[in-house]
Design a protein with these regions (language model features):
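Catalytic, metal-anchored helix/loop core of enzyme active sites in primary metabolism
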Residues: 18-19, 30-36
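Small-residue-rich beta-alpha loop regions that form the catalytic core of phosphotransfer
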Residues: 19, 44-46, 53-98
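Short internal beta-strands
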Residues: 36-43
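Glycine- and acidic-residue-enriched helix-capping/strand-helix junction motifs
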Residues: 17-25
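Alpha-helical scaffold elements within enzyme catalytic domains, especially in hydrolases
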Residues: 29-30, 81
């Protein structure tokens, strides 16, 4: 990734995470207000009733940055899809420890 501004962001969220709706409800509008194009995977789009969604691999190919809200399993699933495209991942732990 170069020093250019991040403009395309993929967002993935753990399904059924209790805090997901609140976090996504604040994060997605904020990113859009910053003039970022936000890509949501199908599960994440369903959580907040968005109609537009993409496959993990498609998001990984197009995004400048991936944001993952969830636990280890969610992060590992996204990392597997993103690995061939060398896209940075910002992980936010919503899982439990242990």
């Amino acid at each position: 990734m170069s020093n250019e501004r991040v403009k395309k962001i993929g967002v993935f969220c753990k399904p059924k995470a209790p805090s997901a709706i609140d976090i996504l409800g604040r994060l997605i509008p904020w990113l859009r207000k910053q003039n970022c194009h936000v890509f949501l995977d199908t599960g994440t789009a369903d959580i907040i009733n968005e109609t537009s969604s993409y496959e993990k691999r498609e998001i990984s190919q197009q995004a400048d940055l991936l944001i993952v809200l969830g636990g280890d399993g969610t992060l590992l699933g996204v990392a597997r899809s993103a690995h061939p495209y060398n896209v940075p991942i910002l992980a936010v732990n919503l899982g439990s420890l242990g």
